Amino acid sequence: MKAKLILALLCLFLFSIHALDATAQTRRGRVRRSTSAAITTPSGLTYLISKKGTGPQLKAGDTAIMHYTGLLTNGMKFDSSYDRNQPFAFKLGAGKVIKGFDEGLAKLRVGDHAILVIPGKLAYGPKGIPNVIPPDATLIFVIEVVDVKSETVTGRPS
Protein backbone atom coordinates (compact mmCIF):
# COMPACT_ATOMS: atom_id res chain seq x y z
CA MET A 1 0.00 0.00 0.00
CA LYS A 2 2.84 2.39 0.91
CA ALA A 3 4.57 1.66 -2.39
CA LYS A 4 1.41 2.54 -4.37
CA LEU A 5 0.99 5.76 -2.39
CA ILE A 6 4.62 6.74 -2.96
CA LEU A 7 4.30 5.88 -6.66
CA ALA A 8 1.10 7.96 -6.96
CA LEU A 9 2.75 10.92 -5.19
CA LEU A 10 5.82 10.61 -7.42
CA CYS A 11 3.63 10.61 -10.56
CA LEU A 12 1.69 13.60 -9.26
CA PHE A 13 4.97 15.40 -8.53
CA LEU A 14 6.37 14.68 -12.00
CA PHE A 15 3.11 15.76 -13.65
CA SER A 16 3.17 19.00 -11.61
CA ILE A 17 6.72 19.78 -12.71
CA HIS A 18 5.77 19.19 -16.35
CA ALA A 19 2.68 21.41 -16.03
CA LEU A 20 4.68 24.19 -14.36
CA ASP A 21 7.33 23.98 -17.06
CA ALA A 22 4.70 24.22 -19.82
CA THR A 23 3.12 27.22 -18.07
CA ALA A 24 6.50 28.91 -17.74
CA GLN A 25 7.28 28.30 -21.41
CA THR A 26 3.91 29.76 -22.40
CA ARG A 27 4.52 32.84 -20.27
CA ARG A 28 8.02 33.26 -21.69
CA GLY A 29 6.54 33.00 -25.18
CA ARG A 30 3.99 35.69 -24.39
CA VAL A 31 6.69 37.93 -22.96
CA ARG A 32 8.88 37.39 -26.03
CA ARG A 33 5.99 38.19 -28.36
CA SER A 34 4.96 41.30 -26.42
CA THR A 35 8.49 42.66 -25.95
CA SER A 36 9.22 42.15 -29.64
CA ALA A 37 6.58 44.83 -30.26
CA ALA A 38 8.48 47.28 -28.06
CA ILE A 39 10.14 50.19 -29.84
CA THR A 40 13.34 51.88 -28.70
CA THR A 41 13.89 55.44 -29.90
CA PRO A 42 17.32 56.94 -30.70
CA SER A 43 17.31 58.69 -27.30
CA GLY A 44 17.01 55.34 -25.49
CA LEU A 45 13.32 55.53 -24.53
CA THR A 46 11.55 52.19 -24.98
CA TYR A 47 7.79 52.02 -25.29
CA LEU A 48 5.25 49.28 -25.78
CA ILE A 49 1.61 49.92 -26.57
CA SER A 50 -0.21 47.11 -24.79
CA LYS A 51 -3.69 48.24 -25.81
CA LYS A 52 -4.36 50.46 -28.82
CA GLY A 53 -6.64 53.43 -28.34
CA THR A 54 -8.88 54.93 -30.99
CA GLY A 55 -8.72 58.58 -29.96
CA PRO A 56 -6.64 61.40 -31.39
CA GLN A 57 -2.84 61.29 -31.49
CA LEU A 58 -1.16 63.46 -28.85
CA LYS A 59 1.05 66.29 -30.11
CA ALA A 60 3.16 69.13 -28.73
CA GLY A 61 0.99 71.81 -27.18
CA ASP A 62 -1.78 69.38 -26.20
CA THR A 63 -2.68 68.87 -22.56
CA ALA A 64 -2.34 65.13 -22.03
CA ILE A 65 -4.58 63.63 -19.36
CA MET A 66 -3.47 60.23 -18.13
CA HIS A 67 -3.27 57.76 -15.31
CA TYR A 68 0.11 56.26 -14.55
CA THR A 69 2.06 54.12 -12.14
CA GLY A 70 5.80 54.76 -11.81
CA LEU A 71 8.09 51.87 -10.90
CA LEU A 72 11.78 51.38 -10.32
CA THR A 73 13.38 48.48 -12.18
CA ASN A 74 13.24 46.41 -8.98
CA GLY A 75 9.43 46.68 -9.15
CA MET A 76 9.07 49.19 -6.31
CA LYS A 77 6.27 51.69 -6.94
CA PHE A 78 7.31 55.28 -6.29
CA ASP A 79 4.22 57.13 -7.53
CA SER A 80 0.78 56.54 -9.00
CA SER A 81 -2.06 58.80 -10.08
CA TYR A 82 -4.40 55.89 -9.29
CA ASP A 83 -3.48 56.21 -5.60
CA ARG A 84 -4.74 59.81 -5.70
CA ASN A 85 -7.86 58.87 -7.72
CA GLN A 86 -6.96 61.78 -9.98
CA PRO A 87 -5.57 61.63 -13.53
CA PHE A 88 -2.38 63.60 -14.14
CA ALA A 89 -2.46 66.39 -16.74
CA PHE A 90 0.43 68.25 -18.35
CA LYS A 91 1.14 70.28 -21.47
CA LEU A 92 3.05 68.09 -23.89
CA GLY A 93 6.38 69.52 -25.02
CA ALA A 94 6.43 72.36 -22.48
CA GLY A 95 9.32 70.84 -20.49
CA LYS A 96 7.30 70.65 -17.26
CA VAL A 97 7.83 66.90 -16.83
CA ILE A 98 10.78 64.56 -17.30
CA LYS A 99 12.00 64.37 -20.91
CA GLY A 100 10.96 60.73 -21.23
CA PHE A 101 7.32 61.65 -20.50
CA ASP A 102 7.31 64.35 -23.17
CA GLU A 103 8.90 62.02 -25.71
CA GLY A 104 6.88 58.93 -24.79
CA LEU A 105 3.44 60.55 -24.65
CA ALA A 106 4.00 62.09 -28.08
CA LYS A 107 3.99 58.49 -29.41
CA LEU A 108 0.53 57.76 -27.98
CA ARG A 109 -3.13 58.47 -28.63
CA VAL A 110 -6.17 58.76 -26.40
CA GLY A 111 -7.18 55.32 -25.16
CA ASP A 112 -3.70 53.81 -25.45
CA HIS A 113 -2.36 51.71 -22.60
CA ALA A 114 1.42 51.69 -22.74
CA ILE A 115 4.59 50.93 -20.87
CA LEU A 116 7.43 53.44 -21.04
CA VAL A 117 10.94 52.44 -20.00
CA ILE A 118 12.75 55.72 -19.46
CA PRO A 119 16.54 55.73 -19.03
CA GLY A 120 18.01 57.89 -16.26
CA LYS A 121 19.22 60.55 -18.69
CA LEU A 122 15.59 61.15 -19.75
CA ALA A 123 14.30 60.95 -16.17
CA TYR A 124 15.91 62.52 -13.09
CA GLY A 125 19.53 62.01 -14.14
CA PRO A 126 22.48 61.83 -11.73
CA LYS A 127 20.62 63.72 -8.98
CA GLY A 128 17.63 61.39 -8.78
CA ILE A 129 15.17 62.27 -6.03
CA PRO A 130 16.67 61.61 -2.59
CA ASN A 131 15.03 58.70 -0.75
CA VAL A 132 12.68 58.06 -3.70
CA ILE A 133 14.54 57.60 -7.01
CA PRO A 134 18.23 56.65 -7.08
CA PRO A 135 20.69 58.60 -9.26
CA ASP A 136 20.55 57.68 -12.97
CA ALA A 137 17.67 55.27 -12.31
CA THR A 138 15.78 53.79 -15.24
CA LEU A 139 12.07 54.27 -14.62
CA ILE A 140 9.11 52.22 -15.80
CA PHE A 141 5.74 53.89 -16.28
CA VAL A 142 2.52 52.02 -16.92
CA ILE A 143 0.28 54.57 -18.62
CA GLU A 144 -3.33 54.92 -19.70
CA VAL A 145 -4.06 57.99 -21.84
CA VAL A 146 -7.49 59.12 -20.67
CA ASP A 147 -8.09 62.31 -22.66
CA VAL A 148 -6.48 65.23 -24.45
CA LYS A 149 -7.24 68.91 -24.59
CA SER A 150 -5.93 70.29 -27.88
CA GLU A 151 -5.08 73.89 -28.54
CA THR A 152 -7.09 75.60 -31.22
CA VAL A 153 -5.60 77.86 -33.88
CA THR A 154 -6.01 80.83 -31.51
CA GLY A 155 -3.74 79.14 -28.99
CA ARG A 156 -6.55 78.60 -26.50
CA PRO A 157 -7.48 75.12 -25.30
CA SER A 158 -10.57 73.67 -26.92
Descriptions of predicted regions:
Residues 2-158:
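Cross-family detector of peptidyl-prolyl cis-trans isomerase
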